[in-house]
Regions:
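Conserved catalytic-core segment of nucleotide-activated headgroup transferases in glycan assembly
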Residues: 1-66
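Short alpha-helical donor nucleotide-sugar binding micro-motif in glycosyltransferases
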Residues: 70-76
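A short hydrophobic beta-strand element within the catalytic core of glycosyltransferases
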Residues: 79-80, 103
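Aromatic "clamp/platform" in nucleotide-sugar-dependent glycosyltransferases that forms part
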Residues: 84
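C-terminal "capping" alpha-helix adjacent to the active site of nucleotide-linked donor transferases
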Residues: 126-159
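A charged, aromatic-enriched C-terminal amphipathic alpha-helix characteristic of glycosyltransferases
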Residues: 138, 152-185
Length: 187
């Protein structure tokens, strides 16, 4: 994904896409609506998803081509990823790859990717079985506290955590590629 653009660590981004129910979007929108003093949240989701008019939420309902989406991901510095469940964690890894300060759910596999050195973990308050896995529902109060924690950080603190995430992402990607090549050579 890369992180060549200048990051704005005062802007929040949430990529709900077509599965906003699983991405914690309703909780995010509810909190943003309660806090008009918070910076603008850029929220990409389908038009039919959860929607509340708030002066500090900018909705993007239109289809975004890859180049435009990458521009948002690479320039907006704080990514909200309070997923109820993740398969592999592509959503979170994309945020890490762009050197974003990432907030996600403190449950597996999300907390296997984001650690306190690489982002902020939001506690969950409820779980529910889903097929062979578990959905973890973030605690709205804890998410609010974590957002306030980010807002209280200096630009440098935000950037350092995001750089740690990017560094881990690059190391992990290199490790994966090496292991894959070794595995394929051994076949």
């Amino acid at each position: 994904m890369g992180s060549t653009s200048r990051k704005n660590y005062n802007q929040f981004f949430h990529l709900a896409g077509s599965s906003s129910i699983q991405k914690g979007t309703k909780t995010i929108v509810t909190l943003w609506n309660r806090h008009p003093e918070w910076p603008t949240l850029i929220l990409r989701q389908n038009k039919k998803s959860f929607h509340v008019s708030a002066p500090n939420i900018q909705y993007i309902h239109d289809f975004l081509d890859d180049e435009t989406l990458k521009k948002y991901q690479n320039t907006l510095g704080i990514h909200l990823c309070p997923s109820e469940a993740e398969g592999f964690g592509h959503y979170i890894l994309e945020a890490m790859s762009t050197k974003a300060l990432t907030l996600t759910t403190n449950a597996p596999p999300m907390n296997e990717l984001i650690t306190p050195e690489r982002g902020l973990l939001v506690n969950y308050h409820n779980t529910k079985p889903q097929r062979l896995g578990t959905n973890y529902y973030v605690d709205p109060q804890n998410l609010e506290e974590k957002i306030e924690e980010v807002l209280a950080m200096s630009h440098q603190q935000r950037k350092e955590i995001a750089e740690n995430a990017r560094h881990w992402y690059l190391e992990n990607e290199q490790f994966f590629r090496q292991k894959l090549v070794t595995f394929l050579q051994d076949l």
